[in-house]
Amino acid sequence: MIRTILSRYVSSNFWSRGATFFFTIFPAFILAATALPACGGSTASSSDRTLAVTIEPQKYFIESIADKSVQVVALVPAGSNPEEYDPSPTVMKRLSEADAYFYIGGLGFEQRNLAAIRDNNPKLPLFEMGKALADAGSADLHGSCTDHSHTDLHAHDPHYWSSVVGAKALSRAAYDALVELYPNEKDKWDKGHDRLNGRIDSVKRLVDTMFANGKADKAFVIYHPSLSFFAQEFGLRQIVIEEDGKEPTAAHLRRVIDQARADGVRIVFIQPEFETRQAEDIAREIGARPVRINPLRSSWEEEILHIARALAHER
């Protein structure tokens, strides 16, 4: 059929001398040409780019900047405890196929697995997002992790994203890494970074407004110290049920209850990835309202505002 059509437009000499080239070499040339990237680097689709992160909140910062230009996979699935979760072979295979791995620094999952990740993936770029905190001017936030005037009865807390300063730092870390990995699209990353920082600033203004009328609580109880940076940033006291990362003793629970009563606590935060019975019991004991939160969800804006509304008693 093709030869019949072409014969109307080419001479008979073509079929005797050029047909072999046309039907064998030329198609191969076309296929090879279409496989080549454009000059100056290609703009790959999101299916061609996969970035691995430790936990869901990191996805928010990368995806907010990249705007569907990359796929982001979390090694610790939603609802799992990153202090205890151990990855399956399937999870580690997904990591090995990624363009880079972003880690928070300090999470139990990372402390147990980072060395093996480096050894098994020597060419995989690794980005520690927490390093950007120093550039964000967060020295005071680092100090808050052991500042008992704001955050009681707990050890080091790596939940940087629970504060605006920490969120800005993670935004910057995500931006810098995207520029390093995909420099040809820096203009896109610039716009995404500016857009994300504007959203973070908007969240800060909303929380400030909620807390400005003097009716918001100044203290709260929580099982795991996930909101240390939030507490420091907004001048709150976080009272932690967990004792040095372990189940609390009876004496520790009594101190928590006494402190909560002294501070007039009206909110006890319940976290799905941790034991909830003790938090619920304390809420009943002191007459506080239990509120379910999930600082490990990927919707950072929604979660921060949900926490603030609970403390401001805005339904």
Name each model-derived stretch.
Residues M1-R17:
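N-terminal secretory signal peptides that target proteins for export/translocation
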Residues R3-I5, F21, I25, A35, ...:
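N-terminal compositionally biased, intrinsically disordered segments and leader/signal-like regions
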Residues S12-N13, R17-P37:
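Bacterial N-terminal signal peptides
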Residues A35-R315:
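Extracytoplasmic metal-acquisition and chelation regions
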